[in-house]
């Protein structure tokens, strides 16, 4: 990706419309550095994807001082997607200029205590307000960030779907590296936990919301015969202890199961005519399997095999460029995709493809698309230049 260093320690990528920049999270004033790198532009919305190594409270409070005329939203990550592809220990800023974008925020303060109908009503009201603000703009999407340890993604996306209408939604579950202890969101200077934020965005720029994974189902199936759905725990598969049976199906010793195993041998469930990934997070001390997304007794799990990750990603990016390359792709990429890339020693190649195609965003604990919460997937929005764009900066 074309990039240049600004008058600070931050690096700005160089799309024509959406502004993006990144900085090492340990510099003295990362938010100010990011602002300088983004340039003197009137932003309606600024997104911050923040390494868990950063001081999140300082980032949040500083963000409303520096970007005081903008809506500022963000979250902690399981890694960042910046100008060079995969990154750790950085902060990525994505600025949406007011000349081409309008945004409103829908905030869910407590994922354990919200009224679904009120949420739906607020989504509809927000969309109507954006339509009144810029009635001549034709394109809309919703971007969701949610606490990645809340185990509430499935319920929230199902509830939000009732208020979407024709407007697509995508998003990602906030991360904490590979520690899995605490994740945070940022909403206009406040730090939130067990919460979610939806950015409702209307734009003059054509957009395409997409979902991509490189997995194909095999004929090997397993049935969940014992589970605690609220905790996303499976204790029995095929009437056998869960971890032991999963290992047997793979031809492995249960003691060998680790994050690399789960990334290389995911399971999928069939919903309608599509398969969706249900990734395993870890093996509990008692041999239960902990999942990243919804699981229940009676669910049929199908073992999946990966296609060539590099070639598949190239093809997906090429498909998004038919008719013209995107200005920017805002993306949520599952942590397990990065783990797989590292394991197969192709992380550099994947990073090169992401950078070449101007993909920015973060590595997640899960991904959302419309009413679905999924795993081991890349979701995002490709943003294209309008035919008669007013360039910024």
Predicted regions and their residues:
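Hydrophobic alpha/beta core scaffold segments
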Residues: 2-393
